[in-house]
Amino acid sequence: MENREGGSQIKIVVSDQLALGTYANFASIVHNFAEFIIDFGRIVPGRDEVQVVSRVVMTPVHLKQLLRALTENVAIYERNFGEIADGPQGGPVARTM
């Protein structure tokens, strides 16, 4: 369960179709005034294209909340398991346009 502002809780429901998740080793991020668009994709060695597997569109406010949650969770992960090594700058894992 997740806590909402004010202390109430919401139940997170994941359908069977989404339960296994989707693998991505690439992300492309674009934005305008009203929204951020994140395309998650898969790069296959030997191919010169990225297959987009999911597109997520978020408001700037929600994206900033996600950024905060990711930052907090990476810090917790690194406390428990050690520092995550950075990949090469401009590599396939994250790309901002």
Task: Map each language-model feature to its residues.
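N-terminal intrinsically disordered, cationic/polar leader segments
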Residues: 1-61, 65-97
